Amino acid sequence: MFNIQTFNAIAKEGLKTFDLEKYVIDANQPADGILLRSYNLHDFDFPETVKAVARAGAGVNNIPVENCSEKGIVVFNTPGANANAVKELVLASLFVSARPILEGTEWVKELPAEDDVEQKV
């Protein structure tokens, strides 16, 4: 069994992909692997049992890669994992910039409350 220690909130759906016959998540025992998002590991004292660090996200700025390499700890990240979120934000930005959507929302909020608004609109 390998013990995976998580930092930050890791999605339950993602954790379900681990074979529970081979991996234990956040057990009270020394970690074999570390899974994190934005948690800063630069001041972290790595136990000798750690074999790998995996970041759920792009980049490794929060992981002391050189220190890990010296200790034989492999570092992974997941570039492109947030690609869908980036696409959604780009499309939303295009819509918001192409039409006065935000201004229209504010205009609607400023309208006086009326009982027969459905008939008027």
Where are these regions (language model features)?
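An N-terminal-biased, well-structured beta-alpha scaffold segment characteristic
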Residues: 1-76
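Phosphate-binding beta-alpha-beta segment of Rossmann-like dinucleotide-binding domains, i.e.
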Residues: 79-121
